[in-house]
Amino acid sequence: LPNLYYRWGREDNYGFERTRIREDENELQKMFDLMNAATTEKIVSDTRPMLDFIANDPQAKEGPVGAVGYCMSGKYIVGIGATYPDEFAALASYYGVGIQTEETDSPHLSAHKIKGELYLAFAEEDVYVPGPLLKSIPEKMAKAGINCRVEVYPGTGHGFAFPERPIYHKQAAERHWERMLALFDRNLKI
């Protein structure tokens, strides 16, 4: 997996203590500041060299590629799909934050450029993607006229797919794998 934060340091050396973010609001804010510094524009720019590397790797299968993002990287999925529409055939986002915002560069505004299949999955109870967005995002994606499925996983919270998290939801996590692998199989023939 690429390190989205390479500009700001290396894993476990980003200026906050990851083990303390749940009990120390200052550490949590430092983490959010770092997350906000990694803009969609920067990640989209970083994606081009990765695509070039894959295209030149003799062990990589030729043809379109897929990508998956969780949490904050969910918005990047929309951004890279819109920027590189001829290369991404399958895109999945799980409890993606920031897919639709009030900003002029909100990822949903460029979604109409996506040519591949897009799957957006959300937690039913997500403080970072509140209920009104869960209603609005499907409407925005339908308006974009793209091949997109939006699904809300009932009884889940943000981070439900990760077994090491207290919010882990086994049934939803298994369904998330089923949906992702089916998406890749339809579009990438894995």
Segments (PLM) and residue ranges:
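N-terminal cap/leader regions of alpha/beta-hydrolase-fold enzymes
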Residues: 1-190
